[in-house]
Design a protein with these regions (language model features):
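N-terminal basic/disordered segments at the start of proteins
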Residues: 12-40
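Short glycine/serine/threonine-rich phosphate/pyrophosphate-binding segments
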Residues: 26-27, 75-79, 114
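Internal alpha/beta core interface subdomains
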Residues: 111-162
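Short, solvent-exposed amphipathic alpha-helical segments in soluble enzyme
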Residues: 32-39, 82-87, 111, 146-147
Length: 162
């Protein structure tokens, strides 16, 4: 498992991480990640959801920097969809299957850091990170990451994509 300073060493900082699990196996995996992650974030909470998941998702989107869903991707997509704003505002959303084999960067791969968190968590679990952004697949620098690194702001993300 990565050392505690591994998160900061990768340029990742976390203000608030939330884990959401729907099953006992999901909760166990969430606990494993929590123990490995330990003191790497200033705040962390875990939520076990049996019902009313839709009601909980909206406040989680507003208050979390990183959301870890321990469930099927389809569940996470359906829960997140109504609250998605844009890539500059959404939290990093990752999906970890109950079996712990894959860590999927689902939302905010670049600016939210989900791609880097996926690699980091995958190391913890000896899992496969799943990254689908084109720049990462091509091993290219992403303009939004480059801008963030140098303290620059992109005024119009639509123009930046051209």
């Amino acid at each position: 498992m990565p050392p505690a300073e591994g998160l900061r060493g990768r340029g990742l900082s976390v203000v608030y991480v939330t884990s959401v699990a729907f099953t006992r196996r999901g909760k166990q995996l969430s606990e494993k990640v929590r123990r490995a992650w330990n003191d790497m974030s200033s705040a962390r909470r875990e939520i076990i959801v049996w019902k009313d998941a839709e009601k909980l998702t909206e406040p989680l989107f507003r208050t979390s920097d990183v959301l870890l869903f321990f469930c099927a991707s389809g569940i996470a997509v359906r829960l997140a969809a109504p609250f998605l704003r844009d890539k500059t505002a959404d939290p990093a959303v990752l999906v970890i299957g109950e079996d712990g084999k894959f860590v999927v960067s689902l939302i905010s791969g670049h600016l939210g850091g989900a791609n880097r968190y996926a690699h980091f968590i995958a190391e913890m679990l000896d899992a496969q990170p799943v990254i689908t952004t084109a720049t990462d697949g091509r091993k290219m620098a992403a303009l939004d990451i480059w801008s963030k690194k140098y303290g620059l702001v992109i005024d119009d993300m639509k123009l930046a994509k051209r």
